[in-house]
Amino acid sequence: MKFHLLLVCVAISLGPIPQSEAGVTEEQMWSAGKLMRDVCLPKYPKVSVEVADNIRNGDIPNSKDTNCYINCILEMMQAIKKGKFQLESTLKQMDIMLPDSYKDEYRKGINLCKDSTVGLKNAPNCDPAHALLSCLKNNIKVFVFP
């Protein structure tokens, strides 16, 4: 139920998107990201706003709490489900949630990282989320994360 409410909030925050332009503005992208962050941060009280800001800036610590916070965001983005990378849904979400200027670079990075979670166990440390985000950070020039 909370996820459906979040999707409605994200859709409202994005506003109408003209059919001729599939992407969103950077402002809309960051607004949607803030909503995700606002849902996931309270679930992981050991992850401070400062740590979340550092993750957004590409400094990705490897600890259970930060990995599970990252997992929460990636699940909301439909990029990971139960520790497994969801290539098709990630590509669909990318087309909806990123400005057009980001898409080619992200499509390449996503395809390079599609196997980064293979063989990793999700419980108890959310390791696949850390592996996926680290791979994306290393393979995408303009890294963005809420």
UniProtKB/Swiss-Prot annotation:
InterPro entries: PBP/GOBP, PBP_GOBP_sf
Segment forming the signal sequence: 1-22
Gene Ontology cellular component list: extracellular region
Principal subcellular localization: secreted
Pfam families per record: PBP_GOBP
Record's keyword terms, sorted: Disulfide bond, Olfaction, Secreted, Sensory transduction, Signal, Transport
Family: Belongs to the PBP/GOBP family.
Protein name: General odorant-binding protein 19a
Record organism: Drosophila melanogaster (Fruit fly)
